[in-house]
Regions:
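Acidic/aromatic-lined carbohydrate-recognition and catalytic surfaces
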Residues: 2-194, 198, 211-285, 418
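Generic enzyme active-site microenvironment
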Residues: 96-97, 205, 281, 339-340, ...
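Loop/helix patches that line or flank the sugar-binding groove of alpha-linked glycan CAZymes
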Residues: 5-7, 217-253, 262-277, 286, ...
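Beta-strand-rich binding/interaction modules
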Residues: 509-525
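Hydrophobic residues within beta-strands of alpha/beta enzymes
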Residues: 48, 204-206
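C-terminal beta-strand-rich structural cap/linker in extracellular carbohydrate-active enzymes
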Residues: 530-546
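Catalytic cores of alpha/beta
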Residues: 291
Length: 546
């Protein structure tokens, strides 16, 4: 029996706000995505993951969902969504949609009903409403903190005008947490899954998959700041300290509780009712020893690998993450996943040093990511080698910036609209009648899709080459064939089947590759081949056919 597509897929993340704007309002839309499906298909990927496009006040760029089974007019209509799925399928691209079960928008009808209802009412029981502590109830019910900074509870004003109960929000106060111990919430979640499955969606990316279950005795936790710190990608340097910060909050009152898997067991049964190998990937940044729970045969299918995303530019550390990842998932038989960036993290070029050096490293890291067994995710613009945009504070939109009083800049720099063509903003992203929702840098002319198509040495050509080979090379198709052989210090070698090897030089000196062969793809034009000898300048790599 053929293995399901998602066990070895390449999946392209589209962030709809910033992909392509066809109606000229400065924000991307679904018809814009349809118009660029040929571009996505030409990359050689198997699927598209769409970040949320549901009705939303956009306080957290759509991760504050007011109606999980509809389309926000800024992105188009439900017919556009249907068309997008149909057109993607016509190009052999699967479609993964985002589901956001941990919380809703405060503008969802449910939350508005809860505000109009009494304490203890069924309407309030869909969320976490509690009386405050202290004689006047003016202290939050627990010491839990929000991932976005500040406290995780906000007090409401009751119908009689008096300050009343508090509600929980792990994120912004406009994102109240849903109560997943409530059967009505559970049933509604299944209805959302069925809605998109019926529409033809091939899978789901499950937002905050580790957060749905809470300890409903609502205990205080030790060191509440650790909750905020543990999830800050900008603080994670792949170190033991960073891992320990996450260990502290894993399997705690608020995160990664074992009961969360009961929800996914129900979800899995629903997905299994449908044909076509539907799948779900968990956004759950948990230590490796907790990961397998999310991808057991009766729970979800994949889990994002944030440790790989956080790995520093260091051959030993990258190797260590790869080995740990493979080991942690092997006993449940789930495929690992690999990603270098997403809409929540600094772009990989910036994370690995920025500028030309960051780009060299990022391109070499992409050779590794694309050569690994399992599934690989590519965040839009990564294939162009984009870095984070520097933005004026006045342009920022991320609630992280506002909730921390500007102490953290937030994630907007990685979310700037994609440059398609031309030499100045909006670079073909929109027709320019209205400003783009985030301003694009004025020096992106060298990074447009059009410019990179014309340059055979561009990041785009490298991504196309490796992603296409991934789909066709027998050594990459075979998921069993994978070895990490010993290599000289500062060099990483990956062996896949059928003579395919990936070699990357992490050092600041040129090295002779310990393996020779024909260069299939190089991360830089300076990689040199003389007879049997392949020379890798600093921060470069190659795929070799031996
Ligand atoms: C993770 C999403 O990727 C992020 O963008 C969002 O802010 C939080 N979850 C809350 O939904």
């Amino acid at each position: 029996m053929a293995t399901p597509w998602w066990t070895r897929a390449a999946i392209y993340q589209v962030y709809p706000r910033s992909f392509r704007d066809l109606n000229g309002d400065g924000t991307g839309d679904l018809r814009g995505i349809v118009s660029e499906l040929p571009y996505i298909a030409a990359l050689g990927v198997d699927a598209v993951w769409l970040s949320p496009f549901y009705p939303s006040p956009q306080r957290d760029s759509g991760y504050d969902v007011a109606d999980p089974r509809a389309v926000d007019p800024i992105y188009g209509t439900i017919e556009d969504a249907r068309e997008l799925i149909a057109q993607a399928h016509a190009r052999a691209l699967r479609v993964i949609v985002d589901v956001v079960p941990n919380h809703s928008s405060s503008e969802r009808a449910w939350f508005q009903e809860a505000l109009r209802s009494e304490p203890g009412s069924p309407e309030r029981a869909r969320y976490h409403f509690l009386d405050g502590r202290g004689l006047a109830g003016d202290q939050p019910p627990t010491n839990w903190t929000s991932w976005f900074g500040g406290g995780a509870w906000t007090r409401v004003v009751e119908l009689d005008g008096r300050p009343g109960q508090w509600y929980l929000h792990t994120f912004d106060e406009s994102q109240p947490d849903l109560n997943w111990s409530n059967p009505e919430v559970r049933a509604d979640g299944l209805e959302t899954l069925r809605f998109w499955l019926d529409m033809g969606a091939d899978g789901f990316r499950v937002d905050v998959a580790l957060g749905l279950a809470k300890d409903m005795s609502y205990p205080d936790i030790d060191d509440p700041e650790s909750l905020t710190l543990a999830m800050r990608m900008d603080l994670d340097d792949g170190s033991v300290d960073a891992m320990n910060r996450r260990r502290k909050v894993a399997n705690s009152a608020v995160l990664d509780r074992d009961e969360v898997q009961d929800v996914y067991r129900e979800w899995r049964q629903v997905m299994d009712e449908y044909d076509g190998d539907r799948m779900a990937v968990a956004e759950a940044w948990v230590p490796p020893e907790r990961a397998a729970r999310y991808v057991a045969p009766d729970t979800l299918h994949q889990i994002f690998n944030f440790d790989f995303m956080a790995a520093p530019w260091d051959a030993v550390r990258v190797r260590g993450v790869i080995e740990k990842t493979m080991a942690s998932l092997s006993y449940v038989g789930a495929p690992p996943t690999w990603a270098l960036s997403n809409h929540d993290t600094p772009r990989v070029v910036s994370r690995l040093g920025g500028g030309p050096l960051g780009l060299r490293r990022a391109r070499a890291m992409a050779l590794i990511a694309h050569a690994l067994p399992g599934a690989v995710y590519v965040y839009q613009g990564e294939e162009l080698g984009l870095s984070d945009a520097l933005l004026p504070d006045s342009a920022r939109q991320d609630p992280v910036f506002f909730r921390t009083g500007g102490a953290q800049l937030g994630r907007d720099g990685a979310r700037v609209p994609v440059p398609w063509s031309g030499s100045e903003p909006p670079y073909g992203f929109s027709d320019g009648s209205l400003p783009t929702w985030l301003p694009q840098p004025t020096d992106w002319a060298a990074f447009t899709v059009e410019g990179e198509i014309a340059d055979p040495n561009s990041a785009l050509h490298q991504y196309r080459a490796t992603l296409r080979l991934r789909a066709a090379h027998p050594g990459l198709v075979d998921q069993q064939a994978f070895v990490l052989p010993e290599a000289p210090e500062g060099v990483l070698v990956l062996e896949r089947g059928a003579g395919l090897r990936c070699v990357v030089n992490f050092t600041d000196e040129a090295v002779t590759s310990p393996v020779s062969g024909r260069v299939l793809v190089a991360s830089d034009a300076s990689v040199m081949v003389e007879g049997d000898r392949v020379t890798l300048p600093p921060s470069t790599g190659a795929w070799l056919q031996t």
